[in-house]
């Protein structure tokens, strides 16, 4: 009798496993998306006649605090100032004034190249002189923990910006980022203190 379709137990098992695999895949994808879903690559180039941009990481971040500092260079270097503001606590945005940087960028006054040479997470001894201040700030934001990441980098201004002789010109610099981990299940870090160059 051809009408009775025999579905073997094996077929049911295979079907069940396939669904399980799909569920796991979607779960992993959702978790990655929750993390931000964006992957950092070692080089970004925007070939634009008016506003060319270049960001290169000679060394890649090793963990989330270093990654947070890396996003700062990526977003700033590509002129994505709306993304920069996501890296900082809400109450610091006015002082950081990314809207002004965005306007300057569109007018051609901007840093057109960042080469990030390396990341170093400092030991407590290395930021001893700032520790009391960092502790107080981190506590005021309710962070679970914080790290201090030192970034060494080179920057190159646009020709138009150089005519205005910026305070920190072209060259090689280091900058410290105090990065705090927000309370909650998702591992989210914010830059709560942007060090002097």
Residue ranges and their predicted role:
Residues 30-78:
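Short, low-complexity N-terminal intrinsically disordered segments enriched in polar/charged residues
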Residues 133-197:
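Exposed beta-sheet edge and beta->alpha loop/turn motif
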Residues 20, 70-77, 85, 89:
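Generic solvent-exposed, charged/amphipathic alpha-helical segments
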Residues 27, 69-70, 116, 149:
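Generic hydrophobic, helix-prone segments enriched in Leu/Val/Ile
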Residues 81-143, 156-161:
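Short solvent-exposed beta->alpha transition segments
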Residues 1-44:
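Gram-positive cell-envelope targeting signals
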Residues 2-3, 64, 150, 182:
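Intrinsically disordered, low-complexity regions enriched in Ser/Pro/Gly/Gln/His and often acidic
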